[in-house]
Amino acid sequence: LSLGKLIVLYDANKVTLDGPLSMSFSENVKKRYEACNWQVLEVKDGNDINEIHKAIKKGKKEQFKPTLIIVNTVIGFGSANQGTNKVHGAPLGKEDGKNAKLSYGFDHDEFYVPEEVYEDFKKKTIKRGKSKFNKWNKLFNEYKEQYPTEAKQLEDAIAGKYSLNI
């Protein structure tokens, strides 16, 4: 059995809801997964997208072992309470949320999605949808040829036309 396509990102923020992770967890995650014959990679800065991308690319090259990528992050980065359990599972609050956004160079007070992000998402979603739709149509047309009666029943059900013979 080969799990070379399995890549897991592990968020190593060292914080739990109750406080520092060290209060309740002493396991060395890296050594544990290495002992289980996983490829273990580490990203030193979870805010470095390029470093994460490189680790994922390296993980994809491994053909036989699963890959664990330990991503070292600071929970609540940019918040006054970053790195603490005070930002774990609790809202930041308006002012602290604004400060966290500013630390990322994002100067919008309210919830906001930049137009270029929205357009990119829309374009990719439409492309993926068309591809899936075309695959479905091809598959359904093949099904119709082999099972015309059942295909008609499915088409009727999709159209909201039900005929029950009980």
Where in this protein do the model-derived segments appear?
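Glycine-rich ThDP/TPP pyrophosphate-binding loop and its adjacent helix/strand module
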Residues: L1-K127
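Thiamine diphosphate
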Residues: E42, E119-I166
